[in-house]
Amino acid sequence: MNTLQTTRRAVVLLLTLLGIHASGLAQQARVSLLSELHKLSDLSRLPEYASGTVVRQTSSYDTTGNNDDGFSGKYSFVRRNPDSSLVIFEAPGNGVVNRIWTPTPNDELLDFYFGGSGKPAFSVKFSDLFSNKLFPFINPLCGNQLGGYYCYLPIPFKNGLRIVSRAKKMEFYQIQYRSFPKQTKVDNFSMQLKPEEQAAIKTLQGSWDLLRQHGNRPDANTKHLHMDTLLQPGQQVTLAEINSPGRINRMVLSPASAFSGNPKQLNIRITWDDEQIPAVYAPVADFFGYAFGSPSMQSLMLGAENDSLYLNFPMPFDRKAKIELIYRNAPNGHLPAQKIQMQLSYSATRRNPEREGKFYSYWNRAISTTPGKPHVFAAGKAKGHYVGTILQAQGLEPGMTLFFEGDDETHVDGQMTMHGTGSEDYFNGGWYAMLDRWDTKMSLPLHGALDYSLPFSRTGGYRLFLSDKLPFENSFFHAIEHGPENNNKRADYSSLAFYYADKPLSPGKAPDNAATTIYTPDTLMLYPQLMKYSVMGNIAIDGNTFTASGDGHLRISLQEIPPGNYQLYADLESNMEGAEVSLWQRQSLLKDQISFYWPKKEIKDRVFLVPLEVTGFKNTITFQFKPDPNRRKIWINRLIFVKR
């Protein structure tokens, strides 16, 4: 028996022994650590409504609308106690904390008070919620990557929960929780875990690996479909049509490379029960988490891996399901035929309309965001719950990705329930444009970064809401700002929202050529903090300051700059220690003398250096220092490449 089969049997056996299969769990009213862990391991229950519950969030966001979302600590607590400790979370009634996030953990203790008690039930260092040093706060539920520190370990509470930090100052944080009706029976979280709770945590990674690779566990009614098709431009093809009640458990499309590139010409359309509004209508690339035309996302529920696309969201329907691919003609030029394969698993298990919603998505491309208004992920009237977001974000103003300062905001049934502290924060990250923080693409089971490029001023992220799915009874609004204040940074946003509901929240727009073309800026910028360097000789690097001893060489990689012809500019500084340098491309001299000397300190923006050609072979520039013991420094704030 291989490792995969052994893991699958262990997970199934554990759930069987615990007696918490989906059919039984739906009938039990008690909320416990075990029941919440089961929501994270058995995702076949994701379509089930969470009626009567509300998900809210306490965060350090600036309530004045400005951008002090944790820097000063002014908004980073509910109240200060007489001993200067900080109440950072307080909720009445019954509930469960589903998510704790911060980019600024500290080593001070957090005290957890249950049910109005004057004595903490347990205390833990804030940093140990994420360090993987303290069980049960371990991977995959708790950890840190991409600049963010996250914990999804459920913390159920009855008759209220208060969390107090012994730190004198807190900075950025978010604590998300679900409140239950008063009559709900809840077992308080305890650090003394029962054997079955320990087992559930330890086997969770295995169950997630199985789900991502193989989809939800098949039942006796599972059937399989396979389709091969050669799709010509201008054609559409029905990949699957099921004319009886059931639910789709997994879909795989291949090759993933067929959906790459610019523009994104292939759309996917999924329709339930002949509804007028498609449940899914989006570019295939956007739906599966590509980043600006290239495969990127490998989440638990959908993504691209091994040149295949996978979709694991359970998708129940009442009478009929239809899945189509549409290959749009290009406005100019020839497109090749695409050979596509599809594998689908589904069962005849009927949807219970009283207890389950249908799966829907909403694709929203804003080629230019509206000043003063946020970008909407999803909005409308229905009953259901929100389960995921994908966002590609492209700045329209060259330079730093300041549009990603925008906060998320959620309104449920007419009331604001959540307000975030920044865009990478929403995706469980932190500190964009910082080395080894939010600076590259990375996929984790529940969240990740699709891309990060300072030269292109673009990024993107995704986040799944599983045990913390956001329920709504009548209406839902979920959006994100673009810019630190008043949505004041122009950007190009493309998003996918995923939710279950009794009907679509709102109709989307059909993806056409104009809305699926990827924006490519004509001005690109390199910043020192993420430049890639090579040096020859003795050169010290400190931020934007480069100091040479003798005739040092500083070579800067241009691999992030696309091939083409550019005018090269620089934002630089000069002063009395400024060196004289020459500029080279490989062995070709581009400019014999560039001076960083000036009698007093002066900042100079957009200084023209040289015309420059970048190719696959010529993708570096080198500054060669001219020896001078008194003038050994250059200061580069950024390099600017303007297409000719």
For the regions a protein language model found, what residue spans apply to each?
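Residue-level detector of intrinsically disordered/flexible regions characterized by low predicted structural confidence
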Residues: L4, A10, D68-D69, S76, ...
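Short, functionally important structural connectors and interaction interfaces within domains
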Residues: V12, Y462-L464, K626
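Short acidic/polar micro-motifs centered on Gly/Asp/Asn
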Residues: L4, T271-D273, P627
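Extracytoplasmic
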Residues: D407-V412, T417-S423, P507-R644
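A generic structural signal for short, solvent-exposed coil/turn residues
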Residues: L18, S23, P92, T104, ...
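Intrinsic-disorder-associated interaction segments
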Residues: L4-T7, R30-E36, E197, I561, ...
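Beta-strand-centric surfaces of beta-sandwich/beta-rich domains
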Residues: Q27-M525
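Bacterial Sec-dependent N-terminal signal peptides
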Residues: M1-Q28
